[in-house]
Amino acid sequence: MSHITTEDPATLRLPFKEKLSYGIGDLASNILLDIGTLYLLKFYTDVLGLPGTYGGIIFLISKFFTAFTDMGTGIMLDSRRKIGPKGKFRPFILYASFPVTLLAIANFVGTPFDVTGKTVMATILFMLYGLFFSMMNCSYGAMVPAITKNPNERASLAAWRQGGATLGLLLCTVGFVPVMNLIEGNQQLGYIFAATLFSLFGLLFMWICYSGVKERYVETQPANPAQKPGLLQSFRAIAGNRPLFILCIANLCTLGAFNVKLAIQVYYTQYVLNDPILLSYMGFFSMGCIFIGVFLMPASVRRFGKKKVYIGGLLIWVLGDLLNYFFGGGSVSFVAFSCLAFFGSAFVNSLNWALVSDTVEYGEWRTGVRSEGTVYTGFTFFRKVSQALAGFFPGWMLTQIGYVPNVAQADHTIEGLRQLIFIYPSALAVVTIVAMGCFYSLNEKMYVRIVEEIEARKRTA
């Protein structure tokens, strides 16, 4: 059985306050995540004194570990049948957010060990952080099918989520370094101070999300009691759900491209453009363009459909990066072309969450088993693998191109940074265009038919 409202699930409209609360949840998640994505590699190389390859290995091991903790979270969520008044997903948002906050701060604490000891300690802390972040963030993301079955409202929630994520990224991009610099003469304490302040705000925002969202469609009994969630079942759910599998491949590419860009832009502005403060100012413009894209996304989807808007966003992204590589030699041109690329990425990153929610019903339609947690965390498994590779690749490449911290870089190092921030993301975006254009088949018409057939089955069961 399910907890179901009396309103038609296909037409139910969500209140503004609930959409805002859901968007605030990804504001919280991205504050807690992006301080690490943006600055942790630089903290490892420039403060802890670790070689770039070691920093990359920390990301590789930790993110691969959390890929499996994501899957474990999905299995745990789909195994829950005794659902209390807090719901199926919301309790994990509430209780996991506190250890995530503490560990996000601890990641920026130095240790008095040698290089090996520092590497081991940093890896352990980052793995623990990833474990609790999986519990919090996977529950947050998997909750959408329990909130609404209206495809337009799901697209709206995806837009609000991306808006919150973009605001979190903007705050971390613009504010972290100035806050860190308030502690003069001690870079280590500056990192700790900034991480503490940002993480506490992340905790507060996540609690606001918890209090403002409502679960309406929660399965309390399995459709097939003999079929219990497990790791093998999770991978089968992905392999047997073609739209989900294609979406996983697309995210493997796009998230890897986006995270490499974020990691390298700190080095690019400092060593290529010789303007380290530019990153803070650029954030206002580039993230502003993302907000415009997020704002335009729901109307664009209603007119053209999710798939066409997704591919269109990728094409804009590629155009912006290629223009930056060939013509973006100065600060002004770098900001302008980056804004174009980030504008395109807004459609891609927003629609990922709406598309994965649609694959829940596709999987239920194909198998008779509704597994929000398994589908969502199978999706995030690929995203974490992408993050693992995106964390390792820049650190490894920094060593390969001859990066030396806190000095002027050689010409071949400069060219390596340019290729990392522009050519690598463009190539992955092109691969994604081919994958989504040729192999993704779940459109709006098919989705409506699937939902109608599922509801008909339930009425006759």
Swiss-Prot record:
The protein's location, in the record's own words, is: Cell inner membrane
Q: What is this protein called?
A: Putative 2,3-dihydroxypropane-1-sulfonate exporter
* Higher taxonomy: Bacteria, Pseudomonadati, Pseudomonadota, Gammaproteobacteria, Enterobacterales
Keyword set for this entry?
A: Cell inner membrane, Cell membrane, Membrane, Symport, Transmembrane, Transmembrane helix, Transport
Q: Which residues cross the membrane?
A: 21-41, 48-68, 93-113, 124-144, 163-183, 189-209, 244-264, 277-297, 309-329, 331-351, 388-408, 420-440
Quick one: which gene encodes this?
A: yihP
One molecular function GO term is: symporter activity
- Xref: Pfam families: MFS_2 (PF13347)
- Residues in the Cytoplasmic compartment per record: 1-20, 69-92, 145-162, 210-243, 298-308, 352-387, 441-461
> Periplasmic side of the membrane: what ranges?
42-47, 114-123, 184-188, 265-276, 330, 409-419
Chief site of localization: membrane
Membrane topology, record value: Multi-pass membrane protein
Task: Return the CDD domains for the record.
Answer: MFS_MelB_like
Note the superkingdom of the native organism: Bacteria
Q: Which protein family is named in the record? A: Belongs to the sodium:galactoside symporter (TC 2.A.2) family.
Record has Cell inner membrane as a keyword: yes
Summarize the protein's role.
Could be involved in the export of 2,3-dihydroxypropane-1-sulfonate (DHPS).
Q: Name one GO cellular component term.
A: plasma membrane
